Amino acid sequence: MAGHSKWAQIKHKKAQVDAKKGKIFTKLVKEISVAARLGGGDPEKNPRLRVAIEKAREVNMPMDNIKRAIMKGTGELAGTTYEEVIYEGYGPGGVAILIEAMTDNKNRTVSEIRHLLSKHGGSLGESGCVSWIFEKKGYILVDKKTIDEDTLISVALEAGVEDVKNDPKEENYEIIVSPEQLNQVKTIIEKAGIPVSFAQVTMLPKNYISIEGEDAEKMLKLMDALEDHDDVQNVYANFDIPEEAMSKAEV
């Protein structure tokens, strides 16, 4: 997955740090509210809401905050209405970037996203320019130190996964599943006594672009800047960056 595992771990650590600052709460409240508005307030009947609540619990968001966000989404409480938007563009070295955002002011958000891309050597593109490069998948990471490959593959295949990858350069096994099966497969793996270090529905690139040196540094700074934006929920990119450069981005 050419660095996807490493970046997923970095994002996970940063989410924990952001949780201490309360920053991640704002983004999760938006996600919970929108999920509840679109699919109803019952997480048992709304998979997207269930995943959003799990993310909120991972960073210790108070249950009262979660309930209020759901009620704002269902209209039981007054609140801001957020609209989902997707921006597509390019980073240094021609890297494809897909940005998922939630905003109450599309004009403001697109202007700020365009500025961030330009500032870090990228550019905003037209709708559809890079989305074809990405596939929506469930993505699970398991630390190699916790289980041997044969045992994991046996459990994973029985759970109905699409693929198990063992990149010698990565610290984790990577498990690919359909988005709808993510929670089910995660539960099966954990019930088999195998700890899951990361699980999320994501957009996986079909191909990667190798960048290094100044382009790699600019790309990582751009990813940080985009993910730090209050309206941005997720950023996906198809970069392949050397391990030493990637390590500099760690918390």
UniProtKB/Swiss-Prot annotation:
Keyword Chaperone in record: no
Example of a GO cellular component annotation carried by this entry: cytosol
Compartment(s) where it occurs, according to its Swiss-Prot or TrEMBL record: Cytoplasm
UniProt entry keywords in alphabetical sequence: Cytoplasm, DNA-binding, Transcription, Transcription regulation
NCBIfam families named among the record's database cross-references: PRK00110.1, PRK12378.1, YebC/PmpR family DNA-binding transcriptional regulator
Family listed: Belongs to the TACO1 family.
Protein name according to UniProt: Probable transcriptional regulatory protein THEYE_A1868
Organism: Thermodesulfovibrio yellowstonii (strain ATCC 51303 / DSM 11347 / YP87)
Phylogenetic lineage: Bacteria, Pseudomonadati, Nitrospirota, Thermodesulfovibrionia, Thermodesulfovibrionales
